[in-house]
């Protein structure tokens, strides 16, 4: 198995690069673990699950097992994890209620759009919409409360910015996943759109890494 895995990574070096990119926020998060609040710990869990998903996905590819269901499952993981990140970050009960409602509605709708053999455009699109909606709601909350001294030293500013960039950048790709990410589409088309998705993910990783790094300033960054 190890030999097959090495050959797989040698053939598809881009896949290995993405897994290394995923490790960057994980490593920085672990380094600054003592500074992480509950929200950032959920983000660390999120990246850990991404790494596990990608590793299992590559193992499945080696043995020619359909791995699309992993990404569909992860759509639910993203909805719940992103929701928990922001639920823990706000104290306003009304905002918490809206976040909980968004999580519940998104997860509920996603169950009707499940597919185990192909990318579910419905689940992945809903996950993007949920991420953008909650991030924008959080931005609106911190702007209205005016409790943060320096926004650039606030971890969730960077996380939210990266999340919005990723979700906005992949929204139409996932919306038309049955066309551009289908097994029946030409490989060049699939590869192009998958690479765009990967670039958006790399940007999110970089923004999140900055978010983990500035956690050391966060406690003294409130009025």
Describe every region a protein language model picked out.
Residues 1-223:
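Terminal, non-globular segments
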């Amino acid at each position: 198995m190890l030999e097959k895995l090495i050959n797989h990574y040698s053939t598809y070096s881009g896949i290995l690069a993405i897994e290394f990119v995923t490790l960057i926020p994980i490593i920085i998060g672990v380094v600054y673990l003592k500074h992480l609040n509950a929200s950032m710990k959920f983000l660390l869990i999120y990246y850990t699950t991404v790494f596990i998903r990608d590793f299992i996905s590559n193992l499945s590819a080696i043995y020619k097992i359909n791995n699309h269901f992993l990404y569909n499952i992860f759509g639910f993981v993203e909805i719940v994890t992103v929701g928990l990140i922001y639920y823990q970050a706000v104290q306003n009960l009304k905002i918490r209620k809206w976040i909980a409602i968004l999580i519940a509605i998104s997860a509920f709708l996603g169950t009707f759009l499940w597919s185990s053999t192909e990318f579910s455009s419905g689940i992945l699109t809903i996950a993007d919409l949920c991420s953008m909606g909650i991030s924008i709601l959080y931005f609106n909350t911190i702007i209205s409360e005016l409790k943060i001294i320096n926004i650039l030293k606030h971890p969730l500013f960077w996380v939210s910015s990266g999340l919005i960039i990723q979700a906005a950048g992949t929204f139409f790709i996932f919306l038309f996943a049955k066309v551009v990410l289908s097994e029946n589409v030409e490989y060049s088309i699939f590869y192009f759109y998958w690479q765009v998705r990967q670039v958006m993910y790399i940007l999110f990783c970089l923004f999140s890494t900055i978010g983990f790094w500035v956690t050391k300033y966060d406690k003294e960054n409130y009025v």
